[in-house]
């Protein structure tokens, strides 16, 4: 990824300390997919230039920590994700997830961030284009 100047996508599941040690060592650009860390870690990660992805799990009852992390993060480093076919948002939890359900995650995140849903959708789409180099003038290849 570094040689090709491409982002990496990391899924850190119950391995925050070793993951952050690797991030300190290699300083990659990319995304923490399905972010599950706390607000303090989110602040550190985004200060390193990383993006944080939030999916259907952000709509679950126990998602307070993830939502606090989203609130602690710069809006230009937040992403919406689906994690298809898993982690469908409430009210579809336990069912097959698909990209058509992302609006449910956006609604919860927008409410928590106190921004209009359309603004969140526009912003996170622009963030995705930026991190993958799909902006105008970008390479257009991922």
Regions found by a protein language model. Give the residues of each.
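Short, basic, glycine/proline-bearing loop/turn elements
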Residues: 49-55
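Active-site phosphate/pyrophosphate- and oxyanion-stabilizing loops and adjacent acidic/basic residues
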Residues: 67-68, 107
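Mid-to-C-terminal alpha-helical segments outside catalytic/metal-binding sites
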Residues: 102-142
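Non-cysteine beta-strand/loop elements that form the S-adenosyl-L-methionine
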Residues: 76-84
């Amino acid at each position: 990824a570094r040689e090709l100047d491409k982002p990496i996508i990391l899924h850190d599941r119950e391995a925050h300390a070793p993951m952050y040690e690797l991030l300190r060592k290699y300083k990659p650009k990319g995304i923490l997919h399905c972010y599950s860390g706390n607000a303090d870690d989110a602040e550190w990660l985004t200060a390193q230039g990383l993006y944080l992805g939030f999916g259907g799990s952000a709509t679950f009852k126990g998602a307070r920590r993830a939502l606090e992390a989203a609130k602690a993060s710069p809006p230009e480093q937040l992403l919406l994700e689906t994690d298809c076919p898993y982690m469908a948002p409430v009210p579809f939890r336990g069912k097959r997830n698909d990209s058509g359900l992302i609006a449910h995650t956006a609604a919860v995140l927008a409410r928590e961030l106190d921004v209009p849903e359309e603004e969140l959708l526009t912003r996170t789409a622009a963030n995705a284009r930026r991190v993958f180099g799909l902006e105008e003038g970008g390479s257009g290849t991922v």
